[in-house]
Amino acid sequence: MVQVNENYLKLKAGYLFPEIAKRVKIYSQSNKSAEIIKLGIGDVTEPLPRACIDAMSKALDDMGTAEGFRGYGPEQGYSWLREKISEHDFISRGCQILPEEIFVSDGSKCDSSNILDILGKDNSIAVTDPVYPVYVDSNVMTGRTGDALENGTYQGLTYLAINEGNNFLPELPQKKVDILYLCFPNNPTGATITKEELKKWVDYALQNKSLILFDAAYEAFIQDNDIPHSIYEIEGAKDCAIEFRSFSKNAGFTGVRCAFTVIPKNLKGLSSTNEEIDLWPLWNRRQSTKFNGVSYVVQRGAEAVYSLEGKKEVRGLIDFYMENAKIMKNKLQTAGYKVYGGDNAPYIWIKVPDQMTSWNFFDFLLQNVSVVGTPGSGFGLSGEGYFRLSAFNSRSNVLDAMERIINI
């Protein structure tokens, strides 16, 4: 009989969001008339920008002609999209990222997991706590951790707590760590990082020859001018950081699937014989072998994000969701809740009432007012006592949910 990858057996009971879905399903089956409002998973709700729809429609028409038909595209992404990304997302901010350093993909969730394919298994790893679960679970699945402990952490990982005490900004590791996962604006806490604080991490990575895996999936939601949108705004970052970006949240592409990862050509790693190895060719080979590229139609839709009309419509989507976040934060604070995030990110991070755990509060809201959020403990040990609400929903649902919660 075939042997299984036993690393999967080390995973905790279930990925956070399937566990939420299971509880909601049980509740809905017993309360068939309940009008459930889901503010849990960070999925968008508003229609795609018209500029993107028109571009994809035209691309489909192109595919229906002999002249315009496209088969397999470049695994790295079409040059015209990579050039737009380079110009608008990086060069415009003073970041000298070349088009060929950009790899178009079908999701930053995939890329942040798949990047491990080109990194050795003996690297030491640090994650924030709480943390986006994919960072931890993907390392468990690939055998880079020890066993799960009773408190939900894993042997072999360094956890960097983020909480009220440190303004949700992790302290630098006390020892040398090879791989550092950072996400700003942060999921799940909604916290942001200044250029001065981010420079400390870049300096640490350069000094220790570490690699930063920087998730900037929510950079488009930044409202304050002094907050960096890219780690490459920090001098030296091209020598120590990989950045993940996505069209999912800013342009509503969660169901369309398009993202990109930046692998600067400066980046190097070490072989077992201490030979310096460029990371760019390794990722290029990985993608060429394991990935067939994002469809032509989808990439034309992503390209339209950078058109004048596309930028305007994307800005409208971001403003809409951030207004949702503002409404949620204001109403919850008025009701006496201690609330974080929501100013430069589409997530609200709530301190749950005393004597309640995060899952207690989840069940309390579900059972009493049919509102679904995400228990903070699902993001890590330091997330216990907190609760995440997402601003990705219709205005009417957000207003309804807030009224339900504050009137319990």
From Swiss-Prot:
Instruction: Enumerate the cofactors the protein uses.
Output: pyridoxal 5'-phosphate
First-tier enzyme category under EC = transferase
Q: In which pathway does it act?
A: Amino-acid biosynthesis; L-lysine biosynthesis via DAP pathway; LL-2,6-diaminopimelate from (S)-tetrahydrodipicolinate (aminotransferase route): step 1/1
Which of this chain's residues are annotated to bind pyridoxal 5'-phosphate?
Y72, S108, K109, Y132, N187, Y218, S246, F247, S248, R257, N292
Name its GO BP terms in alphabetical order: lysine biosynthetic process via diaminopimelate, diaminopimelate-aminotransferase pathway
InterPro entries for this protein: Aminotransferase_I/II_large, DapL/ALD1, PyrdxlP-dep_Trfase, PyrdxlP-dep_Trfase_major, PyrdxlP-dep_Trfase_small
GO terms assigned for molecular function = L,L-diaminopimelate aminotransferase activity; pyridoxal phosphate binding
Q: Where does substrate bind?
A: Y15, G42, K109, Y132, N187, N292, R388
Name the Pfam families on file.
Aminotran_1_2 (PF00155)
Q: What keywords is this UniProt entry annotated with?
A: Aminotransferase, Pyridoxal phosphate, Transferase
Q: Which HAMAP family match?
A: DapL_aminotrans_1
Role this protein plays: Involved in the synthesis of meso-diaminopimelate (m-DAP or DL-DAP), required for both lysine and peptidoglycan biosynthesis. Catalyzes the direct conversion of tetrahydrodipicolinate to LL-diaminopimelate.
Record's protein name: LL-diaminopimelate aminotransferase
